[in-house]
Amino acid sequence: CNEGCLDGFANLDMPHITCLRNPAVGREAECIITPSDNPRTVLVAGGGMAGMMAARTLRKRGHRVILCEVSNRLGGQFILAGSTPHKLDMKKAALEMGEQIVNLGIDVRLNTPVTAELIRQLKPDAVFNCVGSSPIIPSIPGSSMPNVVESHDIIDGKVKVSGNVVIIGGGMVGLETADLLVESGLTPPTVLEMGSAVCVDMGSARKYCMMQTIEDSKIACVTDIKVIEISENMVIGEKNGEHLEFPCDYAVFAVGSHSRDSHELKEACSELGIDLITVGDAKEARRALEATREAFDAALAF
């Protein structure tokens, strides 16, 4: 991903380089994994990068770990990220961490949502809340129309689009979706961004490559525009007080993510007197770099 290493050299706000796959990089002396004096049973809710990092670190410290994932695979959104052009290494990173989880003998339960009933049944000593985030669907007139889809579903192959495509959101996910559509043979989509620039959530290395892709692929980007309506064949936006129309066969939302609802977990743990540790996107939707470091640090301190 280059965000912890290459971007670490360029970003003066970062005290040292780090690594999504190894959060101890740059601070090895303070991140020694030592056996716990009090091994406990820990239920980890969510098998994305944060959940796997927490589970792996907890297991290495001697805790008994039960890792539950609501879907049929480990890796979470990192698997999706690795399905876009030029990012296969990210999918490999998620798959390799999944292999480490299995090799450590962690009790992995796929297709298993962590509910209050499951917590009462397993009676863990603690629960790590790593349920992640889900895409934001804005409340825009027309957002529920059948030609309106979500970027994650395109990347995951659940939805196929064709013809003219307008992508709402010019951050990393929106632009990588545009890149994926161009690579699959579609007409370069139009990307609409509310802010004054695209790629603002990308690290410097990835941003440089994406800006080159935008130019080479002739992806049209319109900034400082607010989408106000979606119709059967049109996305309507407002820019500088003027209404602009963008003909489309499909409109795609890529406007970011928000933490998944953890209300049931919090209530169940509070009722049973069980420690609840919330990390990663379940705490706040961010990059995987922050999610894995937060999970690692929490598991180390547990």
Regions found by a protein language model. Give the residues of each.
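Membrane-interfacial segments at transmembrane helix termini in multi-pass membrane proteins
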Residues: 21-25, 31, 74, 80, ...
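Cysteine-cluster motifs in flexible loop/terminal segments that predominantly coordinate metals
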Residues: 1-39
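Rossmann-like dinucleotide/flavin-binding elements
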Residues: 36-70, 74, 109-123, 130-147, ...
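Generic secondary-structure signature for well-ordered alpha-helical cores
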Residues: 3-10, 24, 102-106, 219-220, ...
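Active-site/binding-pocket entry motifs
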Residues: 4-7, 11, 24-28, 133-135, ...
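Rossmann-like dinucleotide-binding cores of NAD(P)H-dependent redox enzymes
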Residues: 64-104, 179-225, 283-285
